[in-house]
Amino acid sequence: MFGKGGMGNLMKQAQMMQDKMAKVQEEIARMEVTGEAGAGLVKVTMTGSHSVRKVDIDASLLEDDKEMLEDLIAAACNDAARRVEENQKEKMAEVTGGMQLPPGMKMPF
């Protein structure tokens, strides 16, 4: 099925991809994204590993309704998480050459 050295080359390529994936995952964990809500009145900065680093609330919101502020914080967190996911997909697509992995399949194996 594989020519001379074909299996060895395939294994070498798989190892190289796995090494690249590990580097990309480290890069993703270090990156930061900022999600916003209320036209930027609430901003949440989150790392690639979904840790919230900072919450910025415009002073004008502190005078308003507590429930609205809570909703905006939740929306900003969700926006930041969505941005992390988008960045992860982009970075992984660079490594896999755009190859789509089955849902739920995590790299490296």
Curated annotation (Swiss-Prot):
Q: Where is this region: Disordered?
A: 87-109
| Coiled coil residues, start to end | none
Q: Which UniProt keywords apply?
A: Cytoplasm, DNA-binding
* Pfam families assigned: YbaB_DNA_bd
Give the function comment from the record. Answer: Binds to DNA and alters its conformation. May be involved in regulation of gene expression, nucleoid organization and DNA protection.
User: Which HAMAP family did the record assign?
Assistant: DNA_YbaB_EbfC
Q: Which NCBIfam families match?
A: DNA_YbaB_EbfC
The similarity annotation says: Belongs to the YbaB/EbfC family.
Protein name per its UniProtKB record: Nucleoid-associated protein Spea_1509
Q: Tell me what organism the protein belongs to.
A: Shewanella pealeana (strain ATCC 700345 / ANG-SQ1)
